[in-house]
Amino acid sequence: MEDKKSRPGPRPGGRSALVQAAVHRAVRDIQAQGDAQQLTIPAIAEKAGVTPSTIYRRWGTLAELLSDVAVENLRPDHEPEDCGNFRADLLAWIEQYIEEISSVPGRNMLRTVLAVDKPQNRVQCTTYTLEQVEVIRQRALARGEAVPAGDAILDRLVAPLIYRLLFASEQPDRARIETLVDALLVDG
């Protein structure tokens, strides 16, 4: 009998990762068709080539699965643009971030992540944002610029803009964004 301790853990890119990728792809495909009635676990399972029980076992509910897919879709696909100085880098990044998040799909993804009691998904969204902010900060520090902490950028720039998007349904304009960035740079 094989000792459980000697068995390797899940392989990165193994069967579990392939199942997750297939299920996520099936969700995105069905969402792209625009028919919310078709977004069911049996339909997703059929499209992904897995059984519904596989989805229930891994995600539990449709809402949790949709939250996982939303988190994956919120992952940035490239580093922030390097514009030559911290202020310009931060402005370029936050404007693009807000443009993406304020789109109908972006708002829907945020609401989906927030609707499910799955704190690790919200933490992952924060991690993605902090990683982007940290790239900008490290570039600026390498240029010898003084920069605020990453948490200060989240609290004083990102959070107020996200709040307005979600609760005031307000698309922040460039003037508001610049005001927040400049206040952050003055007060650190």
Each PLM stretch: what is its role?
Residues Q33-A36, Y56-L66:
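HTH DNA-binding helix-turn interface
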Residues A48-P52:
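Short coil turns linking two alpha-helices in DNA-binding domains
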Residues M1-K47:
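Basic, helix-initiating cap at the start of DNA-binding domains
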Residues E99-E100, K118-R143:
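Amphipathic alpha-helical packing segments from all-alpha helical-bundle domains
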Residues T126-L130, A140-L184:
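Hydrophobic/aromatic-rich alpha-helical bundle segments in the mid-to-C-terminal region
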Residues H78-R107:
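Hydrophobic alpha-helical connector segments
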Residues A63-A70, E100-Q120:
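Amphipathic alpha-helical segments used for helix-helix packing
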Residues I41, A70-D77:
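Short, basic, alpha-helical segments at the C-terminal edge of helix-turn-helix-like DNA-binding modules
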